[in-house]
Amino acid sequence: MARLPAWLRAAALAAAVLGVGACAVTPPLSGRAPLPPSTVPPPPVVESVPPPLVPPPPFAVTPAPTPPPAVASVVARAAGNAIALILPLESPTYGRAAAAVKAGFVAAAARAGASARVQVIGHGDDGVLPAFAAAVQSGVALAVGPLTRDDLKTVFAMSPLRPRMLALNQADEAAPLPAGVYALTLAVEQDAALLMRVARSEGVNTIAVVGSDAPFQRRFSQAFVAAWRREGGTAPREYRFDANPEQLGALRRALATQPIDAILLAVDANDAALAKSFLRGRVYASSQITDGLPAQMLYDLENVRYIEVPWLAEPDNPAFAGLPRADYDDPVLERLYALGIDAFAVAQMLAEPTPPDRIELDGATGHLSLLPSRTFAREGRVMAIHDGRVLPESPAR
């Protein structure tokens, strides 16, 4: 079977997993409804994925028992300082994404000399409840996970006793997190809000949106428009991107009649160069705009700005010294690897007997700030394409 082009593989995986925060993609980042209360899933399979690039010292792994009986929802008392990393490593759909997060997490733990503190608990598509029961039974100070939105909803709804948690997704943007739960995600909404602030700081007052029907791109453009409106901006005109020559001609004519300062381009990398050729002025785009593109095609994206995680934006940053570079050939997995790195850095602080009320750090996924809602605000790096090169600009903060 022929190997898919890099951009197509990246786009497909991104549609499934890059929205690991607040996603509504196809399939959503779990793809399964929560289990009915009477269903007891099989025990999770522990630690059967390939080792990370630089194998850390061995981890303690606890087998998962049957979930505890239903009682009032409470945070379990810690019996030590161990950190459990709970991921769908055995899932056919999300196993690769989970393995990338795990690789970043254990690499960061090894660099910190804290490998012995980490327990890795892998599970399949229906095994998140036994996995959390195992973490409770072993008395961990903190559980990192779940990774998928549906698994997180399942834990919230059906796990009455759970450790303090650092979730890697968010069940519902509007709902407050339960007691003892924190959230660190790669939510595209945060990138869209930062890009909106960049546009405002550059004097953009009127903007149009040109986007595809891809779920990730629709989420990105909707988040940008919502942030734009919250800041008092007028509702932008929105145009659907269609590669049909007649439709492209109509798009060019429509944009020519509108006095706008900039355009938000929400398309995948394979459509980016064609779409950009019909656009004039400032162009802002999603982080996938360059995923898998050959270097020569970057010349067609001159002056496009987007948000990227520092792990990819600044590979020579001294802050990342001592962390192995994963050879995924896939920016989506690289971003998830970076999420694992930051998850460990945050987990060390949250696993303290009394977690800090304030956390600020410059991480592999961006500048992280703990909010009163116990979610982490994340600001990536602003990137600009000039003369066929992608360069980071000054931080927008």
Name each model-derived stretch:
Residues 1-23:
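Sec-dependent bacterial lipoprotein signal peptides
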Residues 17-43:
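Bacterial Sec signal peptide processing site at the extreme N-terminus
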Residues 65-78, 85-103:
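Extracytoplasmic "Venus flytrap"
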Residues 105, 111-125, 178-182, 209, ...:
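Short beta-strand elements in bilobed, periplasmic/extracellular small-molecule ligand-binding domains
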Residues 141-210, 214-223, 227-237, 288-296:
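Extracytoplasmic ligand/sensor domains, especially the bilobed periplasmic-binding protein
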Residues 157-161, 206-208, 217-306:
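Extracellular/periplasmic bilobed ligand-binding domains
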Residues 276-341, 355:
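Extracellular/periplasmic periplasmic-binding protein-like sensory domains
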Residues 323-394:
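Segments of small-molecule ligand-sensing domains
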